[in-house]
A protein has these predicted regions:
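Flexible, charged surface loops at secondary-structure boundaries
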Residues: 64-67, 152-153
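A Rossmann-like FAD-binding core segment of flavoenzymes
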Residues: 5-19, 24-27, 32, 88-186
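FAD-site-proximal beta/loop scaffold in flavoenzymes
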Residues: 37, 42, 48-64, 159-193
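Single conserved hydrophobic/aromatic residue that forms the stacking wall/gate
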Residues: 1-3
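Glycine-rich Rossmann-fold phosphate-binding loop(s) that bind the pyrophosphate
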Residues: 74-76
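N-terminal Rossmann-fold NAD(P) dinucleotide-binding loop
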Residues: 79-80
Length: 193
């Protein structure tokens, strides 16, 4: 099995990219458009219930939770916007933010707090996603100030803790930021000629 980093050769005037199937492409330039993936919580039960109660796109999956109770993990702009959007669909939306304060813009925080079916908890660490083998049934949250753990019964969880760059095949070949984004200049060029 070849590693993804073995599929790319960017040195010299001719660049090459090969597919997992062995097909090879050669060019004088390569456009890298690998995008990003949703960051995951990496807690017990999350992977097991992705698509069965753990979701990442409130616009895509929100309608499946009409009239139900959901959690949004993340108190940045994406998380609070998701909570506001889901509040129009769901019976109840509970937001859990790891930090002591929300990071979302103040106007979004005010809107979310004004909604009667949105509840917000800060200093909240997600410990575990629980389910019945078919779907999510609850989430375990640890209060980071008191150490107390509590199970919240609910129907769905929307993870909104940011995106991770899909740049793994290029990380040893191009200069990247500490979070994995490929560094470019004002003309979208990498540091390689």
């Amino acid at each position: 099995t070849r590693r993804s980093s073995d599929l790319v050769k960017l040195q010299g005037t001719e660049k090459s990219v090969s597919t997992v199937g062995g097909e090879m492409f050669h060019a004088s330039a390569v456009i890298i458009a690998t995008g990003a993936s949703w960051r995951k919580l990496n807690v017990e039960g999350e992977a097991e219930y992705i698509g069965r109660g753990v979701a990442f796109c409130p616009h895509c999956d929100g309608p499946f939770y009409q009239g139900k109770h959901v959690a949004v993990i993340g108190g940045g702009n994406s998380g609070i916007e998701a909570a506001i959007d889901l509040a129009g669909i769901c019976r109840k939306v509970t937001v859990f933010e790891f930090a002591d304060t929300l990071k979302a813009d103040q106007v979004l925080q005010e809107k979310a707090r004004s909604l009667p079916n949105v509840e917000i908890f800060t200093s909240s660490q997600t410990i575990k996603v629980d389910g019945n083998g078919e779907k999510v049934t609850s989430i375990r949250i640890k209060d980071r100030l008191t150490g107390e753990e509590r199970d919240f019964p609910l129907d769905g969880i929307f993870v909104q803790i940011g995106l991770a760059a899909n740049s793994a095949p290029f990380r040893n070949k191009l200069e990247t930021t500490p979070t994995g984004e490929i560094k470019i200049d004002a003309f979208c060029r990498t540091t390689l000629p």
